[in-house]
Amino acid sequence: MSLQQKIKAYLKLGKLGVVSLLDLAAVAGAFLAYKHGISLLPIIPMFIGGTLASMGAMIINSGIEIDRDKVMSRTSKRPTVVGYVNRKEAIIVGSLLAILGTALGFIDNILTAFFIALGVVIYIFVYTILLKPRTWLNIVIGGFAGSAAAWAGYTSLTNSLTLEGFLLGFLIFMWTPGHFWSLALKYREDYVNAHYPMLPAVVGITTSARAIAISNTLMIPIVLLLGYYINLIALIAFSILSLFLMFLSYRLILNPTKEEAIKSFIFSNIYLMLILLIMIIVKLI
């Protein structure tokens, strides 16, 4: 296998699509903390470090889950499953990236490095190893891994975590269950076959649809409170986006199908992305 093919395999295992959303959360966190006269340069080591650490965590996850990935159609073609990267390689390379990413966080401050490392620890040890194979609460508690990215971004400029910074991380924590349960509902049989107790594999489609709607509903007050802290423009924009999210959640309850679930999954991605982009834009205006 050529070096170029190996690099492509690791990039695929690094899940750049997922990592890019974490990066956006980190940058949004930094801009949320930004005040006139503060240098934006600390964003650079935080961004690079967070990206490397997040990719490292994803690669380690793929190394750990090879056996279960083999029986899931969604993951059966991962480089770790088809043999391009073995378990030992994935864990070693992923660990090196996570360590390097955390080290870059120290260029800003200890708190930023701590949150970068915390995201890795929660994703690997709490979510992947401890909770995912054992309880449907896996993605609920594991959502704090995403929160850590936002907190790393916020602290990169402030070296402290205030209420507004905490709210951004808590928003991501609240967003995570409904988002991933929507995906798990579509691939419910995969999780059943792999013996993962993801909520849709445990309680069925109808109850899962209700849980997704409830999860999304509980998130919205956090979104609106964060919008209130930012400014009126953000509050109005967040309100409009939240209304559409609730509309899709209501449709999923009325028609709990895989097709509606994937629509909810796709829009929840767009929803969070737009919330984060709006936060950045209003700070630049």
Swiss-Prot record:
Concerning InterPro entries, the annotation shows: Protohaem_IX_farnesylTrfase, UbiA_prenyltransferase, UbiA_sf
Q: Which organism is it from?
A: Saccharolobus islandicus (strain Y.G.57.14 / Yellowstone #1)
Give the enzyme's EC designation.
2.5.1.141
| GO CC terms, sorted | plasma membrane
Miscellaneous comment: Carbon 2 of the heme B porphyrin ring is defined according to the Fischer nomenclature.
Q: What is the protein's major site of localization?
A: membrane
In which family does this protein belong, per the annotation? Belongs to the UbiA prenyltransferase family. Protoheme IX farnesyltransferase subfamily.
Q: Which residues form the signal peptide?
A: none
The terms under GO molecular function for this entry are: protoheme IX farnesyltransferase activity
Instruction: Give the catalysed reaction(s), semicolon-separated.
Output: heme b + (2E,6E)-farnesyl diphosphate + H2O = Fe(II)-heme o + diphosphate
- Which residues fall in a coiled-coil region? none
Q: Please name the GO terms of the biological process aspect recorded for this protein, alphabetically.
A: heme O biosynthetic process
Q: What class of enzyme is it?
A: transferase
Function of the molecule:
Converts heme B (protoheme IX) to heme O by substitution of the vinyl group on carbon 2 of heme B porphyrin ring with a hydroxyethyl farnesyl side group.
- Protein name as catalogued: Protoheme IX farnesyltransferase
